[in-house]
Amino acid sequence: MANVVVVGAQWGDEGKGKVVDIYTEYADEIVRYQGGNNAGHTLVVGEEKVVLHLIPSGVLHAGKRCVIGNGVVLDPEVFIMEVNRLKAAGRLEDDSTLLLSESLHIIMPYHKAIDIAREAKSGDKKIGTTGRGIGPCYEDKIGRRGIRLMDLIDPVAFSRKLRENLEEKNAILERLGEEPLGYNEIYRTYQDFAEILKKYMADTSLVLSKSVAAGKKLLFEGAQGTLLDVDHGTYPFVTSSSTCAGGAATGTGVSPREIHEVVGISKAYVTRVGSGPFPTELLDETGEKLRQVGGEFGATTGRPRRCGWFDAMVIRYAVRINGLTGIALTKLDVLSDFETIKVCTGYRFEGQELETLPAKLETFENCEPVYEELPGWKVDITGVRSYDQLPENAKKYVRRLEELAGCPIVMVSVGPRRDQTMMIKNPFGE
């Protein structure tokens, strides 16, 4: 029996949704532990593309319990829309398997209004927020002003907390040049949401602990990526939650001792959305080629992603921070049309080789990547179903990345569909 965490090993958008979808077959329960609807997991089921922003990818597998933990911030409207869309598509016939932590925090209209207004006034210092209120909601959580799901379904508590928050938030909005928000409409709308959400509410920490005691296999689904972690990422160009494997414990109330395997998801190259340092970024036709061939446009925002060569410094950092036991390598097929492929093996700053990623932003922004060049394979590999059938140069590329990462590659993906995946080792031990 193993409980497995899946984390992004780069700056997000690595293909976690597909990997989680595949691992779900071996898990009993799938748990989302951080972030909000700023994340988008794209899955291809048959010929159908499914994009999920809040609900764990395991929802596409009948009978699997899906849990949204206390570390998540939830936009009720988005959650309800996602549930209804899944039901209409015949993907969620029994929603009793879907649980929400009573302790998760609720995204309010003022969070979104403040998020958008701040970003608009940031000029060239934009973080690249999605404008969905994620950061301001986490601010209220840390500031002990937040509204939790248990508060939302208590009309008296919700009314009091809403009035207190509006007094403060409207003052902020007015300073930002925005119109204040009214109490009545928000109260009525969110009480309607509460009527729908209360059926899903549970003490999910207790539920999950009982599942562990009963020998159930848990799969923890992370959002974003290691380099977007609020503590360990490229601060301040990060998200507002703990995206690393440690967040799986704090974001669910499951003991860290009950986490046995951590799989980091990495593209065979690197992408990033929004601002922030990116040493291997390609601003030429090669970067544009990666973007077009890889379909590198955000599932949540549609924004074009910045693209660059594989960065072993980033992956080694992710291995160390998360305690990765394996790497799932995605989008290897995107590199099939390159004569040669570069891999960043290290950084130089002011002539000195760096041992690890620099914590100081100004240093990171001015790092010079050290590259080695590997031969490409110039063969379409999207139809390959066995690792041994990959072209020799593709296997050499995978082996070199494994050496540089210091961690075994346990899965290779050569396309968006489930069947375009080669599982070298199953973290659930099956």
From Swiss-Prot:
It catalyses: IMP + L-aspartate + GTP = N(6)-(1,2-dicarboxyethyl)-AMP + GDP + phosphate + 2 H(+). Its EC number is 6.3.4.4. Binds 1 Mg(2+) ion per subunit. Substrate binds at A299, T300, T301, G302, R303, P304, R305. IMP binds at D13, E14, G15, K16, N38, A39, G40, H41, T130, R144, Q224, T239, R303. Its cofactor is Mg(2+). The active site is at D13 (proton acceptor), H41 (proton donor). Transmembrane segments: none annotated. One of its GO terms (molecular function) is GTP binding. PROSITE patterns: ADENYLOSUCCIN_SYN_1, ADENYLOSUCCIN_SYN_2. GO terms for cellular component: cytoplasm. SUPFAM superfamilies: P-loop containing nucleoside triphosphate hydrolases. It is found in: Cytoplasm. PANTHER family: ADENYLOSUCCINATE SYNTHETASE (PTHR11846:SF0). This is Adenylosuccinate synthetase. The lineage of its organism: Bacteria, Pseudomonadati, Thermodesulfobacteriota, Desulfuromonadia, Geobacterales.
